[in-house]
């Protein structure tokens, strides 16, 4: 009985790490694919979801309907032009996924990282992310420099 519980605990831990890593991979992939769509004048204020879907830029594991891209937690992912850069917003993230995503992608390469209502410029540390990811339905937005 103890052995079964230990195996189940390890399986859950492995699944949780895989799940969180996948969210980082998905958002990182969308950032890279959107950078490939940059016009000479930047991104304007356009919604890039449909362009990413039509270009086949979404990983096969990512669901979408029309121009709405869904994340693994039931929230949505939006990619919208922000002048010379663009913003990727990921909604309804658990505390764990919020912290992991913000810490992994909230780097000095971003113009800003917004977690719920708090904005950060530069690197987002684990401590900063932990203080900002306060619910089980967090929103993280990354705005690129270009």
Task: Give a label for each model feature.
Residues 1-19, 23:
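N-terminal single-pass transmembrane signal-anchor helix
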Residues 11-15, 27-45:
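N-terminal alpha-helical signal peptides/signal-anchor transmembrane segments
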Residues 18, 22-31, 146:
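Outer-membrane beta-barrel proteins
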Residues 39-146:
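Periplasmic/extracellular, small/polar-rich flexible segments of pilin-like filament-forming proteins
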């Amino acid at each position: 009985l103890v052995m079964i519980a230990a195996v189940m605990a390890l399986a859950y831990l492995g699944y949780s790490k895989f799940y969180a890593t996948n969210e980082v991979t998905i958002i990182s992939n969308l950032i890279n694919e959107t950078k490939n769509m940059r016009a000479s004048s930047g991104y304007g204020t356009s919604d890039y979801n449909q362009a990413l879907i039509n270009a086949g830029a979404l990983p096969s594991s990512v669901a979408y309907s029309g121009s709405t891209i869904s994340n693994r937690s039931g929230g949505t992912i939006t990619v919208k032009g922000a002048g010379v850069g663009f913003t990727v917003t990921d909604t309804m993230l658990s505390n764990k996924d919020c912290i992991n995503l913000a810490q992994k992608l909230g780097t000095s390469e971003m113009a800003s990282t917004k977690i719920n209502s708090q904005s950060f410029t530069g690197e987002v540390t684990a401590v900063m992310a932990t203080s900002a990811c306060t619910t089980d339905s967090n929103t993280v937005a990354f705005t690129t420099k270009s």
